[in-house]
Amino acid sequence: MIKAAVVGASGYIGGELVRLLAMHPEVEITAITSRRFAGQKVHKVHPNLRGLDLRFTNTKEFDADVIFLAVPHGTSMEIIDDYLGSAKIIDMSADFRLREDLYREYYGEHKRPELIEEFVYGLPELHRKEIRKAELVANPGCNATATILALYPFRELTDEAIVDLKVSSSAGGRRENVASIHPERSHVVRVYKPYHHRHEGEVIQETGVKAAFTVHSVDIIRGLLATIYFRFEGSTRELLRKLLVYKDEPFVRLVTDKGGLQRFPDPKYVIGSNFADIGFAHDEENSRAIVLSAIDNLIKGGSGQAVQNMNLMFGLDERTGLNYYPVYPV
């Protein structure tokens, strides 16, 4: 059994990670940590996990083969020395995703730049071989995951793209602020980052395409939809052929139906799963390609992708513990 510890397990990503690991046939959870909730049973913070015999601790010492750092951005680089060398590490924050120049542009000065190159960017569809050999993995951001998966097959067709993102309330995490209370959050379609979103750096790094994000908060609890536009004067057949690079990927589903309930990707149909649904449209009159990508931000955009990476790092089938379909209806 793989012994797993989750550092910072009180947030939404941490809670979903604990849920997935608890159901994983090859994993034993040895520790979940939280400074705020140390000593409390896990279901006091994550009520859906009632019956799971775990308590939060505030220790830095535990028996683990893999440690998940589910902590806020900027924290991992401060605590990484507590865990380096003791176990494989999967970092859920943004601290080690970007090369130093891009990190500086989007986040500021990095406190541990010498460690950046030791981390593998944890998007299995692009870096499966490197992840299998890795000791340190940086889990991608949710918006970056959806956008990179959609844009990567077309990276040779364009050097810039417009990315319109509709994201759920859980993408903002569990932080308490007035904008997140129900009277303020309900029924919104709120632009909260019109340009220079931090996840742009991940897209530039992984695809070479200059992606300009505009991000909207919408009135859903989980899930996100990326709609990507770029100039394209080729054929519809060429667009489809490019997407077929994913035909054997276990967690990418191509949505190309011409009729029925779902003609294009919709986050409603991936909730609770590790799937990314990708589709496209071709606006020939205006010489535009429109590529769409839907994921559950907490699973493929977070905890599920982390488990997928763990599976690869330990030589397991990457579908282990993740091979289930989305919840429906939601």
Swiss-Prot record:
Domain of life per record: Archaea
Residues annotated for NADP(+) binding in this entry: 10-13, 34-36, 297
GO molecular function, one term: N-acetyl-gamma-aminoadipyl-phosphate reductase activity
Disulphide connectivity of cysteines: none
GO biological process: arginine biosynthetic process via ornithine; L-arginine biosynthetic process; lysine biosynthetic process via aminoadipic acid
Pfam families: Semialdhyde_dh (PF01118), Semialdhyde_dhC_1 (PF22698)
Gene3D superfamilies, per the entry: Dihydrodipicolinate Reductase, domain 2 (3.30.360.10), NAD(P)-binding Rossmann-like Domain (3.40.50.720)
EC number annotated for this UniProt entry: 1.2.1.103, 1.2.1.106
Subcellular location as annotated: Cytoplasm
Keyword annotations of the record: Amino-acid biosynthesis, Arginine biosynthesis, Cytoplasm, Lysine biosynthesis, NADP, Oxidoreductase
Record's function text: Involved in both the arginine and lysine biosynthetic pathways.
Entry similarity comment: Belongs to the NAGSA dehydrogenase family. Type 1 subfamily. LysY sub-subfamily.
Name this protein carries in UniProt: Putative [LysW]-L-2-aminoadipate/[LysW]-L-glutamate phosphate reductase
Organism name: Thermococcus kodakarensis (strain ATCC BAA-918 / JCM 12380 / KOD1)
